[in-house]
Amino acid sequence: MAAGKEIRGKIKSVENTKKITKAMEMVSVSKMRKAQERMRAARPYSEKIRNIAANLGKANPEYTHAFMKKNEAKAIGFIIVTSDKGLCGGLNTNLLRAVTGKLREAQSAGIAIESVAIGSKGLGFLNRIGARVVAHVTHLGDTPHLDKLIGPVKTLLDAYAEGKLSAVYLCYTKFINTIKQEPLVEQLLPLAADSLQVEAGQHSWDYIYEPDAQSVIDELLVRYVESLVYQAVAENMASEHSARMVAMKAATDNAGNVINELKLVYNKTRQAGITKELSEIVSGAAAAAGV
C-alpha cells in the first residue's frame, strides 16, 4: 500500500493548502470592506476642492495655473500605482500591460519618459524594463497616508510646472465592483478645462480670499491633483483586496476539487489492493484444497 500512503500524503498537503487559501480569502474580505470605505470617504474631499477651484477659476478667468497650461517638452511622466504583494490574480499584470502599450507609443515617438512607482510590483516592473524611475514609494500598508505619497508625486508635479514635461499620466486599477476591476491610464496633467467647470445649476459664490484668489487657486490645484493620486491609490487598494479574495476563493475551490479527485484515486487504489489480496487468498485456498 505504498501508493495509498503516498496519496494520503498528497491529500493532507492539499488540505493544508486549502486551509491557508481559505484564511487568506477571509482576511481579504475584511480588508476589502475597509478599503472600500476609505475609497468612498476620499471622494467628497477631492470633489469639494474641485468645486471651490472651479468657482475661483470662474471668478478669476484671467489667471491660468501651470497645471492647466500645455507644455511643448519632449518628455512625459507616469505615476504607476500597483500593489506591494502578489496573489491577486491578473490585477497588476493587466495594468502593466496597458502601461507597456503607452510606454512603447512614447518611445517610438522619441519622447523621454520619467516614472514614479507606487507599489513594489510596479517598481520591479520599471526596473526590469530599464525605465527611468525618478521616485518611488512602497510598503504603504493597508492604510495609505497622503504624506507618504506627496514627496514622490511632487517630483513629477514640479517638473510639469517647470515646463519639463508635456503630460503626466496616472496609471491604476479602478474599482468597479467586487468581481470587476478596470486598469486605467488617465491623463493627470495638464488638467482638462472641463474638469474645473462649474456644473450647470450649481450655485456660485463670490468670497473674498486671503491673501488673494491667485494664491488660493495655486494651493488648491496642487491639493486637488494630490487628492486624485490618493483616490487612485485607494481605488487600487480596494481592487487589490477584491482580486485577492476572488483568487483565493478560486484556489480554495480548486483545492477542494483536487482533494475529491485524490480521495477517489485513493479509494480505487485501496479497493484494487483489497481485491488483489482476496484473489490471492481464494487462489491459495483452492490450491490447498486441490492438494
Curated annotation (Swiss-Prot):
Protein location: Cell inner membrane
> Which Pfam family is one of this chain's hits?
ATP-synt
Q: Which UniProt keywords apply?
A: ATP synthesis, Cell inner membrane, Cell membrane, CF(1), Hydrogen ion transport, Ion transport, Membrane, Transport
* Transport keyword on record: yes
Say if the entry is tagged with keyword Nucleus.
no
- GO CC terms on record? plasma membrane; proton-transporting ATP synthase complex
**At the top level of its lineage, which domain of life is listed?**
Bacteria
**Could you cite one Gene Ontology molecular function of this protein?**
ATP binding
Membrane topology field: Peripheral membrane protein
BP term (GO), one:
proton motive force-driven plasma membrane ATP synthesis
What the entry lists under CDD domains is as follows: F1-ATPase_gamma
Q: Which SUPFAM superfamilies is this protein grouped with?
A: ATP synthase (F1-ATPase), gamma subunit
Which residues does UniProt assign to the signal peptide? none
Subunit: F-type ATPases have 2 components, CF(1) - the catalytic core - and CF(0) - the membrane proton channel. CF(1) has five subunits: alpha(3), beta(3), gamma(1), delta(1), epsilon(1). CF(0) has three main subunits: a, b and c.
Q: Which family does it belong to?
A: Belongs to the ATPase gamma chain family.
NCBIfam families xrefs: ATPsyn_F1gamma, PRK05621.1-1
Described by its record, this protein's role is as follows: Produces ATP from ADP in the presence of a proton gradient across the membrane. The gamma chain is believed to be important in regulating ATPase activity and the flow of protons through the CF(0) complex.
UniProt-listed HAMAP family: ATP_synth_gamma_bact
Q: What is the name listed in the Swiss-Prot or TrEMBL entry for this protein? A: ATP synthase gamma chain
Q: Which organism is it from?
A: Variovorax paradoxus (strain S110)
Q: Which gene encodes it?
A: atpG
